[in-house]
Amino acid sequence: MIEKSLFTYFIEAFTKNYANFKGRARRKECWGFTLFYALIFAILGAFAFTGIGVILFLVVFVVTLPPSISLTVRRLHDINLSGWFTLYMLIMLIPVIGEAIAIIISIVIGVVQGSAESNKFGENPVISNK
């Protein structure tokens, strides 16, 4: 079977997995989404200080929030943690210090290898997505 590209995982986050909070997400899916998510916000950041740029930035943020949360929940499932840890990450976005902590936690979640075997959240996505 053909391996999915990083961009395919990004597109599937908005189509197939927009509000999918069940199952698991492999590291490749996590980083594929993160790469294109960061590129979009880097481009929007250049226009964020203009009148329409602020509105566009907020609209894109609101549209991308559900797939971002669902991916984080499924990634937590892959490392055998409850998706409820996502709430702690969202709460930490409020103060500036919390943002730094949330970024570090996001990187750790994206780097830690998932459970090799099936766990209570589903089959290993590395094996089942090939």
Language-model-detected regions and their locations in the chain:
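Hydrophobic alpha-helical transmembrane segments in multi-pass membrane proteins
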Residues: 28-72, 79-111
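Membrane-interface extramembranous regions at the lipid-water interface
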Residues: 1-36, 67-85, 108-130
